[in-house]
Structures are given as structure tokens and as C-alpha cells.
Swiss-Prot record:
It comes from Spodoptera frugiperda. Component of the ribosome, a large ribonucleoprotein complex responsible for the synthesis of proteins in the cell. The small ribosomal subunit (SSU) binds messenger RNAs (mRNAs) and translates the encoded message by selecting cognate aminoacyl-transfer RNA (tRNA) molecules. The large subunit (LSU) contains the ribosomal catalytic site termed the peptidyl transferase center (PTC), which catalyzes the formation of peptide bonds, thereby polymerizing the amino acids delivered by tRNAs into a polypeptide chain. Residues 1-25 are annotated as: Disordered. Pfam families: Ribosomal_L5, Ribosomal_L5_C. The gene is RpL11. GO terms for molecular function: rRNA binding; structural constituent of ribosome. Its main location: nucleus. Belongs to the universal ribosomal protein uL5 family. It is found in: Nucleus; Cytoplasm. The keyword rRNA-binding applies. It comes from the Eukaryota. Keywords: Cytoplasm, Nucleus, Ribonucleoprotein, Ribosomal protein, RNA-binding, rRNA-binding. This is Large ribosomal subunit protein uL5. Coiled coil: none annotated.
Amino acid sequence: MARVPPPALKKDKKEKKPPKDNSKNVMRNLHIRKLCLNICVGESGDRLTRAAKVLEQLTGQQPVFSKARYTVRSFGIRRNEKIAVHCTVRGAKAEEILERGLKVREYELRRDNFSATGNFGFGIQEHIDLGIKYDPSIGIYGLDFYVVLGPTRIQCTTQKTQDWQGWIPPIVLTKEDAMKWFQQKYDGIILNSKK
């Protein structure tokens, strides 16, 4: 029995294609998926209800109360005690509130404000800077802004489809994508991190 020699190896390897330029792809354009506003008072009672009134004036929506997960004696909070209030805003209202918040910050954010997953957040000291009239019975509260960015086609990736041929792989956002979007949309300035 004679041995058959192995088939000749292909010397012509496929050349690697240059990476696609995705900047022209409309489905990769970013938009604000949601804006989360948070006021953490650290205690329940009258101050927390006044903070809820501030969020209701700002967004026009009913805010949600957050409870403490653990009892912390040094902070004076108990488990399941309401200590914060937050609200989620979407659509054109989210863009308008974000614009007012960035105007207070003079469109300047630090690199540390951006997360590795393409989201960013910042805080302001006084809610009256957003254009809400000062009410002595409410007082002054600071609040946090958290912005979740996503591509235009995000609704396609979150739906379960029955035929797997129609499945679209999700677009993974990076810190650089979010910073580039912020600079293009708002002509924002990104400062170096504090050291």
C-alpha cells in the first residue's frame, strides 16, 4: 500500500481587509437613551419630600424613592429607610434638561465623568441654577445627572427575535465614543482628570 502525499498547503492567504469606516453608518449614531436624576438626602422625612418636589418641578414626573440597603449607625440610617429620590427621563425632555445641566457646568466635564461603557454623569450644587425659582419652604438641593447613551438601533438588539438570521449583534460603546459624541453635540470641553 502506497502512501498518498498530503495535499499542498495553500500559499495564497486572503489579504486582510482594512477596517470599515463606521462614521457614515446612520445606525451607529448615538442618542440619549435615558437621563437619570438623583437627589440623595441621606435621611427620610420632610427634607426628602421637599427633594421630591424639586424633581417633580424639574421633570414634570412623579419621582421614585430609594431605600437604604444596610443599617449604618455612623450615618444614622436604618435598613429599608427611604433616603433618596430619583427620576428617569427620556426623549426630548431629557435632552432639554441635560442642556440646562450642562449650561450650569459651562459644558466642561472631566475624563473621569465618562464610564468605560460609554455613559457619563456629573453633579450640580444648587437646583436653582437650572432655572427653577427659589422657594424658601423647599430650600436648595444639589442633584446628580446620569446619562445613558446608545445607538439608534438599540430597540432591535433588545427585542427577542424568533429567526436567528435577523439577529443584530449589539454595538459596544467605549469611553472615547461618548467623549467624541459630547464634544460634537455640545461643543463640550473635556478636562484632564484630577490627580
